[in-house]
UniProtKB/Swiss-Prot annotation, chain A:
Belongs to the small GTPase superfamily. Rab family. Switch I, switch II and the interswitch regions are characteristic of Rab GTPases and mediate the interactions with Rab downstream effectors. The switch regions undergo conformational changes upon nucleotide binding which drive interaction with specific sets of effector proteins, with most effectors only binding to GTP-bound Rab. The modification Cysteine methyl ester is found at residue 200. Residues 67-83 are annotated as: Switch-II. GO terms for biological process: Golgi organization; Rab protein signal transduction; vesicle-mediated transport. The gene is RAB30. The small GTPases Rab are key regulators of intracellular membrane trafficking, from the formation of transport vesicles to their fusion with membranes. Rabs cycle between an inactive GDP-bound form and an active GTP-bound form that is able to recruit to membranes different sets of downstream effectors directly responsible for vesicle formation, movement, tethering and fusion. RAB30 is required for maintaining the structural integrity of the Golgi apparatus, possibly by mediating interactions with cytoplasmic scaffolding proteins. Its EC number is 3.6.5.2. This is Ras-related protein Rab-30. Changing residue 23 to N: Constitutively inactive (GDP-bound) mutant. Decreased colocalization with group A Streptococcus-containing autophagosome-like vacuoles.
Length: 203, 657
């Protein structure tokens, strides 16, 4: 296996109330399917998808909450070293929109301050049951300095666009050298941070 | 969230400390349906790490511990059937005692004004406002009062009260109302968004230069403002690079959730001075403190220790002696003896035998170079990350998580004597086959015959390293030998900002020893040897070489390790107890306990086997060619294995060629 099979690696993290469609968005994007039924996939930690943007291979590591949002028990460590956050609500569920400020507070507390945040209103295929108007969401996202997009994981609307636009943005941020990784990158002469300890590294 | 908890589980785990979290991951991984709850709003129990404001809220909780119980809980008594009995759990935590906080950094009023201005940029944020109150009730040492009380709004009577040191526990309730008012406009300080961080930094630097041209000044409000940068561990531990936690993290793949930094220096404290202990071959040769002869002697001795078993003649005669006696016979100069005894073997003067000492030295040397030139690793963002990472693993395999979830009692079937269910604070009965509970949750009655040890802890925020070198990003461990024989050595860990546990230009220092008195009584003398309070500086010029204390916290924590199951009264056979943090440097106790309990409960199951590689699960997406305007995308999904290995420093053996 080659060591360098991508030019960029980004960690993208999804958050938002339970049931808004986070898992479906990830699976739609990474596997191209809309999972029937409710049951969360057991044992899937994060999903990887490598995309090519303007000739550069970008590896997206997409993390889902593992259901810990259900009882408001997401671990802080989940947010660490994320390059981007996708904050999702359900356009047919007012409650999921009203919880956004609470999520933003959690982001502010635990995520890096350089993280890119995208607000996503999901389930636009259910337009007839919409409870949160596009305008309201746009105003909110503007005030919070977030990008905003509406999607349907079910109909595959805007899902590719969501992740690929995000990848583009992450690349240009990386180019400007303002990426999160720099925060923790050691100064010369110090112990590097050691990640991904794997068995094959010793003996 | 109007979501109801399921009521059938295989295993219910109460408490999210390290052993419980490892067990949760292990159980869930082996296919058990796990419910993992914690009564607190954060993960980790006494293994948690906090931001600065989080720590202050934590303190306040212990201060106010008395008035718990007003909460509406549904009575459990009616829910117990005739054939059952209940074992109630503790209502309030009693594992933390003698909390005492001190602020030495100046409390500049101007800083506050500046931040309130900044706040308007970000009106939506609103973190808890508890910190100021806590600070006010934690008393301020006299030195720093002058600047603090410059504020007219400060109630005068507080001045009298804060002479000397008053612990948080006895904060005056009457004052709190007044305090709230005073804090009214200060409350917002720490809500300043991080996004403004860079800008704020530059403004305050300008201001600093005007005020105090010579030294980079850290004020209390800066600490509060940058409070998010802190990840302050309640328990101070390191990972042995060949230790069982590292092995478990690697084996279970939980290591993918956490990053580490090397501890970069081993320090010694001898004759009032802090020195670096040369431990790797390179260190020994580069040492400026050691003479050529000492270097040769030390190298020879360390090389011998690595393979001491092959030279029994070298130590046979000293089997019955203490290690320190043995070292005296090895031609090591006093400082070399000190280094080996306290900093490398990390043993105590009196109790350690020659064999134990040689073994400890050998272990130390073998751990060197696995990841760097000391045997220790520290997790980025603090020790509190580690239990959380195991919890995530549990959740990934279907475990259900519920913080802020109080359990009122175990329901025990009278006939079988086995526990069937818990009743939570909503009065909901949740059934399971096995129950795992952290010691701190057990009631006084259950623990009546248990003798607990205590750990003395201090947390300091300082402005300089205890041993200054070219680089200001060192992570160090220092063992301060006991002043008198028989007392306990104090372990000091100094963390720099690149460990992501403290703000720039500060250090976070943890002191730990097993308690003989209150934490402050046990540790204050060591603190005074190594640091100087902030305000002493102008008076005492020679003290300038010592780092200054900006903030300090002392507390005692219960050490429930090593308690045999039979000491607890009336535990049903399917209820298992995990202990809180032990006093040791490593995490071996927690890992061993988790593994032992797991094997007891599920003898035929493997403990934390590696999960499938997420990258193997990924479907191939080549069939899709999405079109996104402006980009030329091909979507390629990949099967890859851990190319991340390149992030690792290659292991070097420093002492062996
Ligand atoms: C580099 C290094 C690596 C270590 N790795 C581990 C480890 O992986 N797991 C662990 O449990 N302890 C380890 N230790 C030992 C650990 O530091 C001490 O047990 C701990 O500091 C408690 O000290 P104490 O004063 O209570 O007991 P001590 O009097 O220091 O020793 C208590 C017991 O621990 C045993 N011990 C001492 N050193 C080691 C050692 N290196 N490895 C294993 N057992 C030892 C002794 O034989 C003794 O029975 C290590 C020590 C060093 C210096
Ligand atoms: N109609 C519609 N339903 C969706 C969409 N996305 C998710 N869902 C449904 O919403 C429910 C919750 O989705 P899930 O992805 O598990 O949400 P999560 O809890 O945020 O991960 C499931 O029943 C999905 O089928 C969508 O875009 N449209
Ligand atoms: Mg989900």
């Amino acid at each position: 296996m080659s060591m360098e099979d991508y030019d960029f690696l980004f960690k993208i993290v999804l958050i938002g109330n339970a049931g808004v469609g986070k898992t479906c968005l990830v699976r739609r994007f990474t596997q191209g399917l809309f999972p029937p039924g409710q049951g969360a996939t057991i044992g899937v930690d994060f999903m990887i998808k490598t995309v090519e943007i303007n000739g550069e291979k970008v590896k997206l590591q997409i993390w889902d909450t593992a259901g810990q949002e259900r009882f408001r028990s997401i671990t802080q460590s989940y947010y660490r070293s994320a390059n981007a956050l996708i904050l999702t609500y359900d356009i047919t569920c007012e409650e999921s929109f009203r919880c956004l400020p609470e999520w933003l507070r959690e982001i502010e507390q635990y995520a890096s301050n350089k993280v890119i945040t995208v607000l996503v209103g999901n389930k636009i295929d259910l337009a007839e049951r919409r409870e949160v108007s596009q305008q309201r969401a746009e105003e909110f996202s503007e005030a919070q300095d977030m990008y905003y997009l509406e999607t349907s994981a079910k109909e595959s609307d805007n899902v590719e666009k969501l992740f690929l636009d995000l990848a583009c943005r992450l690349i240009s941020e990386a180019r400007q050298n303002t990426l999160v990784n720099n925060v923790s990158s050691p100064l010369p002469g110090e112990g590097k941070s050691i990640s991904y300890l794997t068995c094959c590294n010793f003996n | 969230m109007a979501d109801n908890l399921p009521t059938e589980f295989d295993v219910i785990i109460i408490g999210t400390g390290l052993p419980e979290s490892i067990l949760a991951a292990a159980c869930s991984r082996s296919g058990q349906r796990v419910l993992h709850v914690d009564s607190r709003s954060y993960y980790g129990g006494n293994w948690a790490s906090f931001s600065f404001s989080g720590l202050l809220s934590w303190l306040k909780e212990y201060q106010q511990n008395n008035d718990i119980g007003e909460e509406s809980t549904v009575a459990w008594q009616d829910l117990i059937h005739e054939t059952e009995e209940a074992i109630t759990l503790r209502k309030k935590d009693e594992t933390i005692q003698h909390t005492e906080a001190f602020c030495y950094a100046s409390q500049d009023v101007e800083d506050d004004i500046e931040e309130i201005g900044a706040l308007q940029k970000n009106p939506s944020s609103g973190v808890s406002s508890t910190f100021t109150e806590v600070l006010d009730s934690a008393c301020l040492p006299e030195e720093s009062q002058s600047s603090y009380f410059n504020s007219d709004e400060m109630p005068a009577k507080h001045t009298q009260k804060s002479a000397g040191e008053i612990s948080l526990e006895i904060a005056d309730v009457d004052e709190s109302v007044e305090k709230e008012k005073y804090c009214g406009d200060k409350t917002c300080i720490h809500t300043v968004s991080d996004k403004d961080g860079v800008k704020d930094e530059s403004t305050s630097t300008v201001e600093d230069d005007a005020n105090q041209p010579n030294r980079n000044r850290i004020t209390y409000s800066k600490i509060v403002k940058e409070g998010r940068r802190f990840n302050i561990d309640l328990v101070s531990k390191l990972l042995y690079s060949q230790g069982s936690l590292i092995d478990l993290l690697i084996k279970s793949d939980v290591s993918r959730y956490v990053e580490f930094k090397n501890v970069t220096r081993i320090l010694a404290f001898r004759e009032g001075k802090v020195e670096q202990v040369p431990c790797s071959r390179a260190d020994v040769f580069n040492s400026k403190e050691l003479t050529m002869v000492e270097k040769r002697i030390l190298m020879k001795f360390l090389t011998f220790c690595l393979e001491y078993e092959q030279h029994p003649d070298e130590y046979q005669a000293f089997r019955q002696c203490s290690f320190s006696e043995y070292l005296k016979t090895k031609k090591l100069t006093p400082n070399l003896q000190h280094f080996v005894l306290h900093s490398i073997a990390m043993t105590s003067e009196s109790s350690c035998t020659t064999i134990d000492g040689l073994n400890a030295t050998k272990n130390f040397l073998q751990c060197l170079g696995r990841f760097g030139n000391t045997p220790f690793l520290f997790p980025l963002y603090g020790q509190g990350e580690i239990p959380q990472c195991f919890c995530r693993m549990c959740a990934v395999f279907g475990g259900i998580y519920c913080l802020r979830h109080k359990v009122q009692c175990f329901v025990v079937d009278k006939e079988s004597g086995r526990c069937k269910a818990i009743i939570d604070h909503f009065g909901q009965r949740i059934n399971a086959k096995y129950f795992i509970v952290e010691d701190g949750y057990l009631s006084e009655e259950t623990c009546l015959n248990v003798q607990y040890k205590q750990i003395s802890r201090a947390v300091l925020i300082t402005d300089k390293s205890i041993l200054k070198t070219d680089s200001d990003q060192q992570t160090s461990i220092l063992i301060v030998p006991p002043a008198e024989p028989g007392a306990c050595a104090v372990r000091v860990t100094e963390l720099c900002s690149s460990t992501m546990t403290c703000m720039k230009d500060t250090y976070l220092v943890h002191l730990t020893c097993s308690s003989s008195k209150t934490a402050r009584e046990d540790l204050e003398s060591v603190v005074e040897k190594l640091f100087t309070p902030y305000a002493d500086i102008e008076i005492n010029k020679e003290e300038l070489t010592k780092p200054r204390l900006l903030w300090a916290l002392y507390f005692n924590m219960r050490d429930s390790s090593g308690i045999s199951r039979s000491s607890y009264n009336g535990l049903p056979s399917n209820v298992y107890v995990c202990s809180g943090p032990d006093c040791g440097l490593g995490n071996e106790h927690a890992v061993k306990q988790a593994e032992t309990l797991f094997q007891e409960i599920f003898p035929s199951e493997e403990f934390c086997p590696p999960p499938p590689n997420p990258e193997d699960i990924i479907f191939d997406g080549d069939d899709k060619q999405p079109e996104v305007p402006g980009t030329n995308n091909t979507v390629i999904a990949k099967l890859q294995s851990s190319e991340e290995s390149k992030n690792l420093e290659s292991p070097e053996k420093h002492l062996q060629n």
